[in-house]
Amino acid sequence: MKTVLVTGGAGFIGSNLVRLILAEEPDTRVLTYDLLTYAGNLDNLRNCLEDPRHDFVRGDICDREAVTAVLGSGNISEIIHLAAESHVDRSILGPRGFAETNVLGTVVLLEAAREAGVERFVQVSTDEVYGSLDSDGSFSEESPLVPSSPYSASKAAADHFVEAFGRTFGMEVLITRCSNNYGPCQFPEKLIPLMIRNAMNDKPLPVYGDGLQVRDWIHVSDHSSALLAVLRGGRPGEVYNIGGGNERTNLEVVRSVLRLLGKPESLISHIDDRPGHDRRYAMNSSKIQAELGWQAGVKFEQGLEDTIQWYMDNAGWLDSVATGEYRDFYSAWYSGGRTAG
Protein backbone atom coordinates (compact mmCIF):
# COMPACT_ATOMS: atom_id res chain seq x y z
CA MET A 1 0.00 0.00 0.00
CA LYS A 2 1.56 3.30 -1.09
CA THR A 3 1.48 6.35 1.15
CA VAL A 4 0.81 9.93 0.07
CA LEU A 5 1.87 12.80 2.32
CA VAL A 6 -0.50 15.76 2.08
CA THR A 7 0.96 18.86 3.69
CA GLY A 8 -1.64 21.40 4.79
CA GLY A 9 -4.19 18.60 4.71
CA ALA A 10 -6.35 20.07 7.49
CA GLY A 11 -6.95 23.23 5.49
CA PHE A 12 -9.62 24.02 2.94
CA ILE A 13 -8.25 22.44 -0.24
CA GLY A 14 -6.16 19.87 1.61
CA SER A 15 -9.04 18.36 3.57
CA ASN A 16 -11.17 18.07 0.46
CA LEU A 17 -8.27 16.37 -1.32
CA VAL A 18 -7.66 13.93 1.55
CA ARG A 19 -11.30 12.86 1.47
CA LEU A 20 -11.13 12.35 -2.29
CA ILE A 21 -8.01 10.19 -2.15
CA LEU A 22 -9.46 8.00 0.59
CA ALA A 23 -12.70 7.61 -1.38
CA GLU A 24 -11.14 7.01 -4.80
CA GLU A 25 -8.05 4.96 -3.95
CA PRO A 26 -8.69 2.07 -1.56
CA ASP A 27 -5.07 0.92 -1.83
CA THR A 28 -3.62 4.29 -0.82
CA ARG A 29 -2.75 5.45 2.68
CA VAL A 30 -2.79 9.19 3.43
CA LEU A 31 -0.62 10.94 6.00
CA THR A 32 -1.78 14.49 6.70
CA TYR A 33 0.84 16.91 8.02
CA ASP A 34 -0.46 20.26 9.25
CA LEU A 35 0.56 22.83 11.86
CA LEU A 36 -3.09 23.70 12.57
CA THR A 37 -2.59 27.44 12.34
CA TYR A 38 -5.66 29.67 12.20
CA ALA A 39 -6.90 28.25 8.86
CA GLY A 40 -6.18 24.59 9.66
CA ASN A 41 -8.86 22.70 11.53
CA LEU A 42 -9.07 19.04 12.48
CA ASP A 43 -12.83 19.30 12.21
CA ASN A 44 -12.30 19.59 8.45
CA LEU A 45 -11.07 15.99 8.59
CA ARG A 46 -13.79 14.68 10.88
CA ASN A 47 -14.80 11.95 8.42
CA CYS A 48 -11.20 10.86 7.90
CA LEU A 49 -9.70 10.66 11.37
CA GLU A 50 -11.19 7.24 12.12
CA ASP A 51 -10.19 5.79 8.75
CA PRO A 52 -7.44 3.18 9.29
CA ARG A 53 -5.78 4.36 6.07
CA HIS A 54 -5.38 7.91 7.37
CA ASP A 55 -2.91 9.30 9.88
CA PHE A 56 -2.49 12.84 11.12
CA VAL A 57 0.71 14.47 12.36
CA ARG A 58 0.80 18.01 13.66
CA GLY A 59 3.94 19.81 12.61
CA ASP A 60 5.62 22.74 10.90
CA ILE A 61 7.07 22.32 7.39
CA CYS A 62 9.84 24.74 8.41
CA ASP A 63 10.94 22.30 11.14
CA ARG A 64 13.61 20.22 9.38
CA GLU A 65 13.87 17.64 12.15
CA ALA A 66 10.10 17.10 12.32
CA VAL A 67 9.72 16.87 8.54
CA THR A 68 12.60 14.39 8.30
CA ALA A 69 11.03 12.27 11.04
CA VAL A 70 7.66 12.20 9.27
CA LEU A 71 9.18 11.22 5.94
CA GLY A 72 11.15 8.48 7.63
CA SER A 73 8.19 7.06 9.52
CA GLY A 74 5.74 5.81 6.93
CA ASN A 75 7.32 4.65 3.67
CA ILE A 76 6.05 7.77 1.92
CA SER A 77 6.39 7.58 -1.85
CA GLU A 78 4.50 10.72 -2.93
CA ILE A 79 3.95 14.25 -1.64
CA ILE A 80 1.24 16.76 -2.49
CA HIS A 81 2.42 20.03 -1.00
CA LEU A 82 -0.39 22.41 -0.05
CA ALA A 83 0.88 23.81 3.25
CA ALA A 84 1.14 27.56 2.78
CA GLU A 85 0.12 30.97 3.97
CA SER A 86 -2.35 31.91 1.25
CA HIS A 87 -4.19 35.15 1.97
CA VAL A 88 -3.02 38.16 -0.04
CA ASP A 89 -4.29 40.71 2.49
CA ARG A 90 -2.33 39.08 5.30
CA SER A 91 0.80 39.02 3.13
CA ILE A 92 0.58 42.79 2.81
CA LEU A 93 0.42 43.16 6.59
CA GLY A 94 3.20 40.62 7.23
CA PRO A 95 5.32 39.55 4.23
CA ARG A 96 8.04 37.83 6.24
CA GLY A 97 5.80 35.04 7.48
CA PHE A 98 4.87 34.23 3.90
CA ALA A 99 8.51 34.02 2.86
CA GLU A 100 9.28 31.75 5.79
CA THR A 101 6.40 29.31 5.33
CA ASN A 102 5.97 29.34 1.58
CA VAL A 103 9.60 29.56 0.47
CA LEU A 104 11.73 28.19 3.31
CA GLY A 105 9.13 25.56 4.19
CA THR A 106 9.08 24.32 0.60
CA VAL A 107 12.88 24.09 0.52
CA VAL A 108 12.91 22.16 3.80
CA LEU A 109 10.34 19.74 2.41
CA LEU A 110 12.24 19.32 -0.87
CA GLU A 111 15.49 18.58 0.95
CA ALA A 112 13.86 16.03 3.22
CA ALA A 113 11.95 14.45 0.32
CA ARG A 114 15.14 14.07 -1.70
CA GLU A 115 16.97 12.43 1.19
CA ALA A 116 14.04 10.08 1.84
CA GLY A 117 13.84 9.00 -1.79
CA VAL A 118 10.30 10.27 -2.35
CA GLU A 119 9.25 9.26 -5.86
CA ARG A 120 6.95 12.12 -6.80
CA PHE A 121 6.48 15.69 -5.53
CA VAL A 122 3.49 17.83 -6.55
CA GLN A 123 3.75 21.54 -5.74
CA VAL A 124 0.33 23.19 -5.47
CA SER A 125 0.65 26.78 -6.61
CA THR A 126 -1.63 29.57 -7.79
CA ASP A 127 -2.61 31.57 -10.87
CA GLU A 128 -1.53 34.68 -8.98
CA VAL A 129 2.12 34.01 -9.80
CA TYR A 130 1.38 35.12 -13.37
CA GLY A 131 0.29 38.61 -12.34
CA SER A 132 -2.57 40.50 -13.96
CA LEU A 133 -4.27 40.23 -17.37
CA ASP A 134 -6.00 42.79 -19.53
CA SER A 135 -9.56 42.18 -20.69
CA ASP A 136 -8.51 39.53 -23.23
CA GLY A 137 -6.48 36.33 -23.21
CA SER A 138 -5.62 33.78 -20.54
CA PHE A 139 -2.57 32.42 -18.75
CA SER A 140 -0.82 29.38 -20.22
CA GLU A 141 1.89 27.32 -18.60
CA GLU A 142 4.42 29.34 -20.62
CA SER A 143 3.24 32.71 -19.30
CA PRO A 144 5.97 34.62 -17.44
CA LEU A 145 5.79 34.87 -13.66
CA VAL A 146 5.04 38.48 -12.68
CA PRO A 147 3.74 38.31 -9.10
CA SER A 148 2.14 41.44 -7.67
CA SER A 149 1.77 40.66 -3.95
CA PRO A 150 4.08 39.28 -1.28
CA TYR A 151 1.90 36.15 -1.29
CA SER A 152 2.22 35.50 -5.01
CA ALA A 153 5.94 36.37 -4.91
CA SER A 154 6.48 33.74 -2.22
CA LYS A 155 4.62 31.13 -4.26
CA ALA A 156 6.57 32.00 -7.42
CA ALA A 157 9.84 31.64 -5.49
CA ALA A 158 8.72 28.27 -4.16
CA ASP A 159 7.83 27.14 -7.69
CA HIS A 160 11.32 28.07 -8.87
CA PHE A 161 12.86 26.02 -6.07
CA VAL A 162 10.72 23.02 -7.02
CA GLU A 163 11.81 23.28 -10.65
CA ALA A 164 15.44 23.72 -9.59
CA PHE A 165 15.37 20.57 -7.46
CA GLY A 166 13.97 18.70 -10.43
CA ARG A 167 16.70 19.92 -12.77
CA THR A 168 19.60 19.74 -10.32
CA PHE A 169 18.85 16.55 -8.42
CA GLY A 170 16.64 14.67 -10.86
CA MET A 171 13.64 14.69 -8.54
CA GLU A 172 10.29 13.86 -10.12
CA VAL A 173 8.50 17.16 -9.53
CA LEU A 174 5.31 18.68 -10.92
CA ILE A 175 3.64 22.06 -10.38
CA THR A 176 -0.05 22.91 -10.55
CA ARG A 177 -1.40 26.45 -10.74
CA CYS A 178 -5.08 26.88 -10.01
CA SER A 179 -7.62 29.67 -10.19
CA ASN A 180 -9.78 30.87 -7.27
CA ASN A 181 -11.30 28.04 -5.23
CA TYR A 182 -14.60 27.99 -3.37
CA GLY A 183 -16.62 25.35 -1.55
CA PRO A 184 -17.03 23.71 1.88
CA CYS A 185 -14.59 24.40 4.72
CA GLN A 186 -13.05 27.56 3.26
CA PHE A 187 -11.85 29.97 5.93
CA PRO A 188 -13.99 33.13 6.03
CA GLU A 189 -11.19 35.55 5.18
CA LYS A 190 -11.60 34.62 1.48
CA LEU A 191 -14.15 36.41 -0.70
CA ILE A 192 -17.04 33.96 -0.97
CA PRO A 193 -17.21 32.70 2.64
CA LEU A 194 -16.59 36.23 3.94
CA MET A 195 -19.53 37.53 1.94
CA ILE A 196 -21.73 34.60 2.94
CA ARG A 197 -20.96 35.07 6.64
CA ASN A 198 -21.50 38.82 6.60
CA ALA A 199 -24.71 38.52 4.58
CA MET A 200 -26.05 35.83 6.92
CA ASN A 201 -25.48 38.27 9.80
CA ASP A 202 -26.76 41.36 7.94
CA LYS A 203 -23.33 43.00 8.12
CA PRO A 204 -21.74 45.16 5.40
CA LEU A 205 -20.08 43.28 2.56
CA PRO A 206 -16.73 45.03 1.88
CA VAL A 207 -15.89 45.20 -1.83
CA TYR A 208 -12.52 46.52 -3.00
CA GLY A 209 -12.65 49.52 -5.33
CA ASP A 210 -15.22 49.28 -8.10
CA GLY A 211 -15.55 45.51 -7.64
CA LEU A 212 -14.89 44.86 -11.33
CA GLN A 213 -11.80 42.73 -10.78
CA VAL A 214 -12.29 39.44 -12.66
CA ARG A 215 -11.51 36.00 -11.25
CA ASP A 216 -11.96 32.49 -12.64
CA TRP A 217 -13.75 30.34 -10.07
CA ILE A 218 -13.37 26.60 -9.56
CA HIS A 219 -15.13 24.37 -7.05
CA VAL A 220 -12.72 22.72 -4.63
CA SER A 221 -13.95 19.27 -5.65
CA ASP A 222 -12.86 19.95 -9.24
CA HIS A 223 -9.48 21.23 -8.05
CA SER A 224 -9.03 18.12 -5.90
CA SER A 225 -9.77 15.80 -8.81
CA ALA A 226 -7.27 17.72 -10.95
CA LEU A 227 -4.57 17.34 -8.30
CA LEU A 228 -5.16 13.61 -8.12
CA ALA A 229 -5.03 13.38 -11.92
CA VAL A 230 -1.67 15.21 -11.97
CA LEU A 231 -0.29 13.03 -9.19
CA ARG A 232 -1.21 9.88 -11.08
CA GLY A 233 -0.62 10.86 -14.69
CA GLY A 234 1.26 14.15 -14.94
CA ARG A 235 4.59 14.27 -16.74
CA PRO A 236 7.59 14.94 -14.46
CA GLY A 237 8.96 18.46 -14.71
CA GLU A 238 5.74 19.87 -16.13
CA VAL A 239 3.41 22.67 -15.01
CA TYR A 240 -0.36 22.20 -15.26
CA ASN A 241 -2.82 25.10 -15.16
CA ILE A 242 -6.19 24.34 -13.58
CA GLY A 243 -9.17 26.60 -14.21
CA GLY A 244 -12.90 26.37 -13.75
CA GLY A 245 -13.96 28.35 -16.81
CA ASN A 246 -16.17 30.55 -14.63
CA GLU A 247 -15.02 34.16 -14.99
CA ARG A 248 -16.94 36.61 -12.83
CA THR A 249 -16.29 40.08 -11.48
CA ASN A 250 -16.08 40.27 -7.71
CA LEU A 251 -19.19 42.43 -7.72
CA GLU A 252 -21.11 39.79 -9.69
CA VAL A 253 -20.11 37.17 -7.13
CA VAL A 254 -21.18 39.36 -4.21
CA ARG A 255 -24.52 40.13 -5.83
CA SER A 256 -25.10 36.41 -6.46
CA VAL A 257 -24.47 35.65 -2.79
CA LEU A 258 -26.96 38.31 -1.73
CA ARG A 259 -29.57 37.11 -4.22
CA LEU A 260 -29.29 33.48 -3.12
CA LEU A 261 -29.58 34.51 0.54
CA GLY A 262 -32.45 36.91 -0.14
CA LYS A 263 -30.49 39.90 1.16
CA PRO A 264 -30.50 43.48 -0.20
CA GLU A 265 -27.67 44.90 -2.30
CA SER A 266 -27.62 47.85 0.09
CA LEU A 267 -25.34 45.67 2.26
CA ILE A 268 -22.54 46.16 -0.30
CA SER A 269 -19.91 48.62 0.96
CA HIS A 270 -17.22 49.73 -1.51
CA ILE A 271 -13.90 50.30 0.27
CA ASP A 272 -10.45 51.51 -0.82
CA ASP A 273 -8.86 49.10 -3.25
CA ARG A 274 -6.14 46.73 -2.09
CA PRO A 275 -2.54 47.74 -2.91
CA GLY A 276 -1.29 45.94 -6.01
CA HIS A 277 -4.70 44.43 -6.70
CA ASP A 278 -4.56 42.40 -9.94
CA ARG A 279 -7.34 43.31 -12.34
CA ARG A 280 -8.04 40.00 -14.03
CA TYR A 281 -7.05 36.33 -13.92
CA ALA A 282 -8.03 33.71 -16.50
CA MET A 283 -6.59 30.23 -16.96
CA ASN A 284 -6.04 28.14 -20.08
CA SER A 285 -6.55 24.55 -18.91
CA SER A 286 -6.18 22.90 -22.32
CA LYS A 287 -2.97 21.10 -21.35
CA ILE A 288 -4.40 19.16 -18.40
CA GLN A 289 -7.56 18.49 -20.40
CA ALA A 290 -5.66 17.09 -23.38
CA GLU A 291 -3.02 15.12 -21.49
CA LEU A 292 -4.96 13.82 -18.50
CA GLY A 293 -8.58 14.00 -19.64
CA TRP A 294 -9.54 16.24 -16.73
CA GLN A 295 -12.51 18.59 -16.96
CA ALA A 296 -14.11 20.90 -14.41
CA GLY A 297 -17.59 19.57 -13.73
CA VAL A 298 -19.26 22.00 -11.31
CA LYS A 299 -21.11 24.95 -12.81
CA PHE A 300 -20.55 28.11 -10.80
CA GLU A 301 -24.21 28.89 -10.13
CA GLN A 302 -24.91 25.43 -8.72
CA GLY A 303 -21.62 25.28 -6.85
CA LEU A 304 -22.26 28.65 -5.22
CA GLU A 305 -25.76 27.63 -4.19
CA ASP A 306 -24.42 24.37 -2.69
CA THR A 307 -21.64 26.26 -0.91
CA ILE A 308 -24.06 28.73 0.65
CA GLN A 309 -26.22 25.85 1.81
CA TRP A 310 -23.18 24.16 3.37
CA TYR A 311 -22.33 27.29 5.37
CA MET A 312 -25.94 27.64 6.48
CA ASP A 313 -25.99 24.00 7.58
CA ASN A 314 -22.62 24.39 9.33
CA ALA A 315 -23.08 27.75 11.03
CA GLY A 316 -21.46 26.31 14.15
CA TRP A 317 -18.29 25.51 12.21
CA LEU A 318 -18.27 29.02 10.79
CA ASP A 319 -18.66 30.64 14.20
CA SER A 320 -15.99 28.39 15.73
CA VAL A 321 -13.29 29.32 13.21
CA ALA A 322 -14.15 33.03 13.11
CA THR A 323 -12.86 33.64 16.62
CA GLY A 324 -10.20 35.83 18.25
CA GLU A 325 -7.34 35.77 15.74
CA TYR A 326 -9.66 36.13 12.76
CA ARG A 327 -11.57 38.96 14.41
CA ASP A 328 -8.34 40.78 15.19
CA PHE A 329 -7.25 40.51 11.55
CA TYR A 330 -10.66 41.55 10.24
CA SER A 331 -10.69 44.61 12.48
CA ALA A 332 -7.11 45.59 11.61
CA TRP A 333 -7.57 45.16 7.87
CA TYR A 334 -11.07 46.43 7.20
CA SER A 335 -11.04 49.18 9.82
CA GLY A 336 -7.38 50.18 9.71
CA GLY A 337 -7.66 53.19 7.47
CA ARG A 338 -9.73 51.48 4.78
CA THR A 339 -12.89 53.41 4.07
CA ALA A 340 -16.19 52.81 2.39
CA GLY A 341 -16.54 54.53 -0.96
Located regions from the model:
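N-terminal Rossmann-like NAD(P)+-binding domain of SDR-like oxidoreductases, especially those catalyzing
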Residues: 1-181, 306, 311-314, 320-341
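C-terminal substrate-binding subdomain of Rossmann-fold SDR/epimerase-dehydratase oxidoreductases
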Residues: 5, 18, 30, 59, ...
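Residues that form or flank phosphate/diphosphate-binding pockets in enzymes
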Residues: 13, 39-40, 65, 186, ...
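A glycine/serine/threonine-rich, flexible loop-to-helix segment
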Residues: 48, 137, 188-196
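Residue-level recognition of oxygen-bearing side chains
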Residues: 66, 97, 104, 187-191, ...
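Proline-centered turn/helix-capping motifs that create local helix->coil transitions or kinks
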Residues: 122, 131-135, 170, 186, ...
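The catalytic Tyr-centered alpha-helix of NAD(P)H-dependent dehydrogenases
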Residues: 147-154, 184, 188-192, 216-220
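Hydrophobic alpha-helix immediately C-terminal to the catalytic Tyr-X-X-X-Lys motif of short-chain
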Residues: 157, 161, 165, 195, ...
